[in-house]
């Protein structure tokens, strides 16, 4: 369930200093399309109208909002409400979009747990855009309760915890994602960044080295290994990695700027936490 491109989600977190510079990606063009949400009318006309509404929501969200709201008034049900939510998201009304995604998930009752998990996941992504990482993590926890075998949900919640600088929780979620998706370079790099921010350069080095055994020219993994080596006093190894990054990436890229900072001996400094993580709670029943 990857509703936003992973690189785009990193950008949304505004963690370029704390997490890999892969964050510098284009702003996402839209949330992933779901099947029509209304359990009352799944006929071909309903599906056609839903798809048309979603296309408009992504391309011209301000035009799509009144169209979707009118459709809802005509009995479009949950599918129309979902189109409203996506249009709100694309129009930058992230808090309202998150509330709408949550409301749709709740109003579905106990039906279609996989679809409800996607809706909670979309709510989490909208909360991240709204700068509410704590609410994002809560929504993502609801999604995980419904679909705990989806590694993307664990990654998303790990990124929300990273936005709160709750590094042990972020690492734990990346651990779980790696169990579900072994040897994934992207997750290894994310966990390396989390270990680095948790002041454990040895574990960061291990994850970065593992990623580089799979993808030797992965610029973010090279940066993570370089910064971990820098902390551990291995300046020659660090410089080798930073120089390799400069050969691989455009000179005006964020990765290049980070590599240049590393060559000067500078370590990335994470930004302030967006919000404080909620205290751990016992697992709830399915919502």
Question: Where is each model-derived feature located?
Answer:
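Structural signature of tandem alpha-helical TPR/SEL1-like repeats
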Residues: 60-63, 93-100, 130-139, 164-176, ...
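Helix-start (N-cap) detector for alpha-helical repeat units in TPR-like alpha-solenoids
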Residues: 46, 78-79, 112, 117, ...
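Canonical positions in the second alpha-helix
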Residues: 70-71, 103-104, 142-143, 176-177, ...
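N-terminal leader/linker segments that initiate helical-solenoid repeat arrays
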Residues: 22-83, 92-99, 272-287
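Canonical tetratricopeptide repeat
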Residues: 83, 122, 156, 190, ...
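Structural marker of alpha-solenoid helical repeat scaffolds
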Residues: 73-74, 107-111, 146, 180, ...
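Residue-level recognition of tetratricopeptide repeat
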Residues: 52-54, 86, 125, 159, ...
């Amino acid at each position: 369930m990857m509703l936003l491109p992973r690189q785009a989600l990193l950008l949304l977190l505004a963690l370029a200093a704390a997490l890999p510079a892969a964050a510098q990606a284009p702003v996402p063009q839209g949330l992933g399309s779901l099947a029509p949400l209304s359990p009352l009318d799944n006929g071909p006309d309903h599906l056609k109208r839903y798809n048309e509404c979603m296309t408009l929501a992504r391309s011209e969200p301000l035009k799509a909002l009144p169209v979707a709201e009118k459709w809802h008034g005509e009995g479009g049900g949950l599918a129309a409400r979902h189109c409203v939510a996506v249009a709100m998201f694309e129009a930058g009304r992230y808090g309202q979009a998150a509330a709408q995604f949550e409301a749709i998930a709740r109003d579905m009752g106990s039906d279609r747990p996989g679809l409800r998990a996607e809706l909670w996941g979309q709510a989490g992504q909208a909360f991240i855009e709204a700068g509410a990482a704590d609410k994002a993590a809560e929504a993502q926890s609801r999604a995980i309760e419904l679909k705990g075998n989806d590694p993307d949900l664990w990654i998303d919640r790990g990124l929300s915890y990273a936005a709160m600088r709750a590094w042990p929780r972020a690492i734990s979620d990346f651990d779980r994602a790696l169990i579900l998706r072994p040897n994934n370079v992207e997750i290894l790099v994310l966990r390396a960044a989390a270990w680095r921010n948790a002041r454990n350069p040895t574990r960061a080095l291990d994850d970065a080295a593992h990623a580089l055994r799979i993808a030797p020219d992965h610029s973010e993994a090279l940066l993570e290994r370089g910064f971990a080596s820098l902390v551990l006093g291995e300046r020659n190894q660090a410089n080798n990695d930073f120089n390799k990054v400069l050969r691989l990436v455009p000179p005006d890229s964020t990765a290049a700027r980070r590599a240049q900072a590393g060559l000067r001996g500078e370590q990335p400094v994470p930004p302030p936490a967006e919000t404080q993580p909620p205290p751990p709670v016992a697992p709830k029943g399915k919502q």
